[in-house]
Amino acid sequence: MPPRAPRPAGAVSPPFPPLAGPPLKARAPRARDSPLTSPCRAHAAMASVVAPAASSSAAAPGADAFLDAACPEDVARALAAELEALRALGHDVGAPAPGASRREAALFITRAVDGLKAFSRVDERVYVACGKLVHLRVRSREADLDAWLASPELALIPAVAAAVRRHRARVEAALRWFWREAYPALYARGLQSALKYEEMYLARLEHGRCEAMDQFFVRLAAAAATATRRPMALVLCGSDAWPEVFDAYFRALATQAIVPATPLMLFAGRARGSLASCYLLNPLPRTTEEAVRAITDEVAPILLRRGGVGLSLQSFNRTPSGDCTRGIMAVLKALDSMTAAINSDSERPTGVCVYVEPWHADVRAVLNMRGMLAADESLRCDNIFSCLWTPDLFFQRYQRHLDGERAVKWTLFDDRASHLASLHGPDFAREYERLERLGLGVESLPIQDMAFLIVRSAVMTGSPFLMMKDACNRHFHTDTRGAALATSNLCTEIVQRATPGENGVCNLASVNLPACLAGGAFDFAALRRAARVAAVFVNAMMRIGNYPTGASVEGVRRSRSLGIGLQGLHTTVLALDMDMADPAARRLNAAIAEELLYGVMDASVELCERGLRPFDGFEHSRYARGVMPFDAYERVSLREPMRWDALRVRIAEHGVYNAQFVALMPTVSSSQVTESSEGFSPTFTNMFSKVTISGELLRPNLPLMETLRRLFPRECARRDAVARLERAQWSVAAAFGELPAGHPLAKFKTAFEYDQELLIDMCADRAPFVDHSQSMSLFLTEPADGKLHASRVMGLLMRAYNLGLKTGMYYCKIRKATNNGVFTGGDLVCTSCHL
């Protein structure tokens, strides 16, 4: 692809040669967000393009002048080339009129994509072509560099804009590299990737303009470079010169080697928004007044900045009485209503997960607060989630039940036993049983009944999540005896201390594993480099984060917690021609986790070697004693033990800059821009469908579709194979029967088709190298009779417990027996942790 020159000052559009060659990536014209985000940004953006008369009278003249100008010649030529390529595929969608305006070209692309996208079901080339068209629509409306720098709507931080202007020649050189080297791959990703960029991440500017793809990456890289201290710069690239630092960030971001969290992509470099993703709160309220004050003073400011919240309310544990007639549920209803109100006008909804322990007096009410389980509207809380912070004792008693012991009980306590929340392990078990003997419990029920209530709620409502209290405390980097950790975050992958004066705060980014493939093999050196860049990038952004509360500022100051994750594990395994169940894939899975941890820790140690101070409390941490996260696990096999030994010595001598390093989050949003599989999970389906106000958006499994094209070179045979998959609910096994080992199609299983015990075991393989946790969901298919037994889910939770995992269950996703095999979107999810 010929290079594209950056736009000169004042130019209407940059010179951009006709786009030819392999299909590139694109963005769709209309809203593709979930109903929760309606009206979404893309819909609003297109409304301003197609019907500017609806805009304010002040803005309309400028918008009219820009949008009614002729579509740039380079975009028109590229559009003509793409339409010709579509005609070669048998799809003639016409063409815009000669000399069409920007508005007319955008409207034409909108209609073309809406008419073509349904063909993605049978032809992956159309899916990619639609993406290319959307990219062209973005280019038809993008601002020039000067307009972008000066945009009041974008509101660049003055220091960031000044740095770009000061080093403009170097920035423009980076842009030439981008259009020549990085953009062709982005352009070829697919429709969903392009849609996600246009709808969510590219800023909308004045007069119908939008942020360009290259400007988006400039904004992120320039913000990070401006915030990077000299020691960070030396760790990153060996130079503290701003242009060198900018280049290092820009190339890693533009090639999608690293993908920042959604708050960073939205707000980095801008004088608005907060950059942190995850907030953990434990305000310790004991009364209704204290609980309401915590919600309004601590939770609301975070939600208004679009952060996701994990909130411990274990301390609010009063049985109904004269001055507290509804226990915790009145407070949860207030929290639910506030969350709904804040999300009602948000382009990016977020959420709250409330943490309680399973001995909380109101735990059954919490389990019944969502969906059909809510007894009446006054108790319904569909806008928040719950998670059980579950001690080992619960699983030990359930195991006794499984072993045949009769009348195994589980006891609920009120605030007379509030000190149990600060205990874990044997200390908790001894005190819990002492309180039982004293008769202080408010109620006892059979352990199997309690287990059933948990599973029923998870299966029917998507909540509660379940985390292992003792595992989280056992593996924490400081001693938590007598001051147990009480909460995780919204998506169950962050493990931090939270107190009334100090929130846990974590800043996130992920490494895109498919970007680490080279020559048909996995490049561990590339992974290590990406992990180091991600660590320095997030540390730099942490310095300029606009945190919503004083307790959040204190949490960042003390721990500097990183959450570097991964995405595209299943995509990578497929690209290496492996099945997730292959022993080689199991080994690769663990090796990737080890290399990720090493890369992040190595960078963090080097920051201290170059003069930065270790995190507050390092001297009391396990790191100071030479203990690594994996040392508490049995039978851990290291790829290169000697380098870990050397790292221990370096830590003992210099310290480590960050208190925490690796968190494996879901990456729902960011894996859409890379078209990679989410996080560490297998893909949910071979044909994803999302229904929005403008129709159905399909996302085929591109590697599967490309494999079918190779296996069935005759078009009629390929179409027949696709039809078989369609009839078989997009299950390869159901469509083609039992395939021999090594068959090119045999590896295309979905998360619902894999043995869930295998997926849990793979989490356990990674666990020694994940000092936070992993957002592990369960993917279960309902039996033909429609009855999913609670014992099946509990069996999986017991396996997670016995393997020492910290997260036992994030979502419990159920595929109905009558499902058509096309996994539908629209679930209530948080884009802060999902990246």
UniProtKB/Swiss-Prot annotation:
Q: Name one GO biological process term.
A: deoxyribonucleotide biosynthetic process
Reaction catalysis annotation: a 2'-deoxyribonucleoside 5'-diphosphate + [thioredoxin]-disulfide + H2O = a ribonucleoside 5'-diphosphate + [thioredoxin]-dithiol
Residue ranges for the region (Disordered) are 1-39
What is the main EC category here? Answer: oxidoreductase
Q: Where is this site: Important for hydrogen atom transfer?
A: 278, 506
Positions marked as site (Interacts with thioredoxin/glutaredoxin): 830, 833
- Gene3D superfamilies referenced in this protein's UniProt entry, alphabetically: 3.20.70.20
Q: Where is the active site?
A: 489, 491, 493
Q: Which cysteines are joined by disulfide bonds?
A: 278-506
- Superkingdom of origin: Viruses
Site (described: Important for electron transfer): 810-811
HAMAP family per UniProt: HSV_RIR1 (MF_04026)
NCBIfam families named among the record's database cross-references: NrdE_NrdA
Q: What does this protein do?
A: Ribonucleoside-diphosphate reductase holoenzyme provides the precursors necessary for viral DNA synthesis. Allows virus growth in non-dividing cells, as well as reactivation from latency in infected hosts. Catalyzes the biosynthesis of deoxyribonucleotides from the corresponding ribonucleotides.
* Oligomer status and interactors: Heterotetramer composed of a homodimer of the large subunit (R1) and a homodimer of the small subunit (R2). Larger multisubunit protein complex are also active, composed of (R1)n(R2)n.
Its protein name is: Ribonucleoside-diphosphate reductase large subunit
